[in-house]
Amino acid sequence: MRTLRYAIVDVFTATPLEGNPLAVFTGADGVDDETMQALARETNLSETTFLQRATEGGTARLRIFTPAEEIPFAGHPVLGSAWVIARATPIHLIGFETGMGLIPVEIEREGGTLIGGRMTQPDPLIGPADVDVEELGRALGVPLIGEPAKAANGINHLLCPVADVAKATPDMQALAEYDVHTIYLWAPVRDGIMRTRMFSPLDGIWEDPATGSAAGALGAHLLQSGVVAPGRITMLQGVEMLRPSYIEVDVAPGEAPRVGGSCRVVARGEFQL
């Protein structure tokens, strides 16, 4: 019998039971792919991660699973997994070996207290979305106020501008026809905050409370299209799920987006297999 230890981390929040929950398994060397996938189904969170010994010069190898499949990269799994490592050791820079290469995460401390982390994401490929805007609006249950865009950073995103994300009433069957991992709604900044929502019918996720990969891709798109100036964008997601999540996205010309925030470990346990 083997014992596998894990932590549940609420990501993109400093408040327990908010943000996006993540299961992080430590010491996962030798765990086969089938077992990792089965554990991801068992935890039944949007993502579950497994930390293994590094083989390519990083701090650790990071495997990321949804309940349905392994994925090469996602934002909140990277940040939450880094938080678990940073709580255990006074490290300031973590390099995760992922399916998208080495992802660096800068650890932020204040007076020795862990307060946040900031990852440099893969630079997304961004282009126009060849879709019928009115039809997409009907599928979302809210009209678009501009042209959507597609972005890819290991995950494929459809970025959709709307006046008010809270008014969306998505038709998941219709949205699944767009064949992207995330459909990311965003509304113009108000009082310094940009509101977002994410739907992922292809992955069987009705809604996700915090989506770091989509937030980074959106930030890069908004800078590229002149909607925002270089600097930090604070995105608020998960409100409609009663799990508010604050995602900070730093964008600058010629640089990959940097995405960060805080986390909170809310549970620990073990599986005996």
What is each model feature region?
Residues M1-F73, L79-L273:
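Active-site proximal loop and beta-alpha junction motif in alpha/beta enzyme cores
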